[in-house]
């Protein structure tokens, strides 16, 4: 049943006029765990891995420029007609496998209520013919949207989060909300049972934004620094596991042949095992060129997100800094993250203080609680 909740991480408060949670200085950060070849035992029963198709090599054209979100070639004339999209995508059991994650340039994964995460998927340089299922906005959107001047596509939000959205004119005037009867969304109950049946696609959202006279292309998009050169002093790893919750974790496994990280999630059948996280359209395992783990303070708020009374969390990533783990090219790098202003991208540095650059391609960013009560980040070395 669709209705507004009064907002889950990834973020009905007593009064809709409440101000957003005040950012507080982060406490001293825990150190990044030391790599141990035996930190995580291999699953007792390995799940066969779906075939990973090699990604096509992009061929630059005279009109080609580098996508600011991925560092891959894209048409300059195409970028001139677009503004970044940030689509809220669910990640509970009935919502998997999702549509459209494989086409996102950049994905943020944030812990939500019920011990599960929610995705904030960024689209700019790739087209997605199906994106589902679209879900409600969270506090984290208010911190991420200003970085890219993005168009938020969502299905409502709690009263408190909607109030905060209305206070930000730039977000308010460009967002696309299914519950406001904005165009760009379709119900497809034959493909997914309600309330997980709200679909969209990138072209429909850009067309809907134009119909509402949303400025295109918007403010300049920050360029995320990428390089084909692998940084020095990385640690060769076979797998890295991120415990977002006691009942849900993500494991990135390195596929040397395809030169990508393959995404796996906790199994509902085998507590120690994992299953491939698949793309609904292709039935192939989701992959990434980069994964970034940002350790940040998570503060519980008084915003109620669901009928069970689950409370939203505020992830303190503005005016803050902390430890980070970077994954690329089959290696793990320890480093730091920093972000001073709401409209700024993160500054990433390696342990030696040198700037960290991502590998060209798609990226997943995990926000990991600094004071997690669950297992630490586990690493299996090669």
Predicted regions and their residues:
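Hydrophobic core
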Residues: 11-14
């Amino acid at each position: 049943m669709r209705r507004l909740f009064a907002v889950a991480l990834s973020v009905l408060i007593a009064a809709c006029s409440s101000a957003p949670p005040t950012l507080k200085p982060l406490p001293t950060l825990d150190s990044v765990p030391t790599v141990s070849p035996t930190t995580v035992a291999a699953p007792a029963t390995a799940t066969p891995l779906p075939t990973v198709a090699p990604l096509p090599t992009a061929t630059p054209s005279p009109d080609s420029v580098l996508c600011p979100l991925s560092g891959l070639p894209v048409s300059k004339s195409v970028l001139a007609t677009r503004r970044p999209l940030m689509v809220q995508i669910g990640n509970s059991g009935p919502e998997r496998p999702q549509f459209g994650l494989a086409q996102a340039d950049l994905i943020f994964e944030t812990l939500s209520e019920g011990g599960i995460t929610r995705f904030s998927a960024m689209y700019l340089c790739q087209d997605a013919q199906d994106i589902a299922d679209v879900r409600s906005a969270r506090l984290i959107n208010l911190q991420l949207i200003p970085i890219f001047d993005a168009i938020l596509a969502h299905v409502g939000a709690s009263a408190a989060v909607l109030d905060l959205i209305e206070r930000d004119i730039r977000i308010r005037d460009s967002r696309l909300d299914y519950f406001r009867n904005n165009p760009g969304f379709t119900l497809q109950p034959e493909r997914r049972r309600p309330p997980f049946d709200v679909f969209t696609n990138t072209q429909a959202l850009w067309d809907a934004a134009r119909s509402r006279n949303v400025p295109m292309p918007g403010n300049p998009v920050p360029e995320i620094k990428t390089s084909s050169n692998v940084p020095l002093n990385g640690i060769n790893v076979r797998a890295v596991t991120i415990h977002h919750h006691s009942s849900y974790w993500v494991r990135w496994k390195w596929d040397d042949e395809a030169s990508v990280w393959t995404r796996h999630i906790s199994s509902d059948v085998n507590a120690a095992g994992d299953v491939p996280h698949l793309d609904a359209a292709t039935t192939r395992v989701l992959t990434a060129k980069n994964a970034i783990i940002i350790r940040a303070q998570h503060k519980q708020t008084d915003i109620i997100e669901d009928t069970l009374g689950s409370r939203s969390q505020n992830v303190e990533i503005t005016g803050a800094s902390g430890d980070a783990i970077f994954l690329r090219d089959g290696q793990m790098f320890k480093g730091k993250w920093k972000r001073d202003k709401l409209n700024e991208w993160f500054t990433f540095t390696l342990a030696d203080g040198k700037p960290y650059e991502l590998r060209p391609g798609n990226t997943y960013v995990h926000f990991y609680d600094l004071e997690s009560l669950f297992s630490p980040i586990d690493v299996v070395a090669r």
